[in-house]
Amino acid sequence: EEQLEQVKAVAPNYLVKTSTDHLSSAEEEAIEIMLGWHKEIGPRLLASDTSHLKWIQLISAGADYMDFDKLREKGILLSNGSGIHSVSISEHVLGVLLAHTRGLQESIQQQMQHTWNQTAPSYQQLSGQKMLIVGTGQIGQQLAKFAKGLNLQVYGVNTSGHVTEGFIECYS
């Protein structure tokens, strides 16, 4: 709701509707900017000869489901959310890695069972270890940056094997 009000404030000359609003055929045809992809309205607008659609801003990084030829033919701008989740995904990956190498799952289970088995968890030191990241795009680069902070030696895999910033070496 707050974001919707912010959009309305910066675009007072536009009518802002959400996917939960009922749109008449005329309102649908008048859409100029679409935030996110509506699986029913979007294809109708692309197929229409009278649609005013000019820009689609996806909220995801992936756009492989879009009809690029139709977008190009109609002159519709397409942008995506590439990289917007790179920090949160990288933090999650490192959190899971740390939980695994420090035996946190076993420790939590023992705590819930009110037991303490000093020999059960096997702790592994991450510092100095090698990490291979499949994909050297924005998420992979952010993960590499965080991993270097833990003194990991970071290698990558990408489509061409080109060296990417933050990686010691990359493979294809």
Q: Model-found features: residue ranges?
A:
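An N-terminal-biased, well-structured beta-alpha scaffold segment characteristic
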Residues: E1-L77
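Short gly/ser/thr-rich secondary-structure transition/capping motifs
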Residues: N13-T20, G36-K39, Q110-T119, G166-S172
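Generic structural signal for small/hydrophobic residues in well-ordered secondary structure
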Residues: M34, I56, L71, V93, ...
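Phosphate-binding beta-alpha-beta segment of Rossmann-like dinucleotide-binding domains, i.e.
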Residues: I76, G81-K130, G156-T159
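Short, charged, surface-exposed secondary-structure boundary motifs
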Residues: A26-E28, Y65-D69, S88-H92, E165-I168
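Rossmann-like dinucleotide/phosphate-binding beta-alpha-beta segment
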Residues: P121-S172
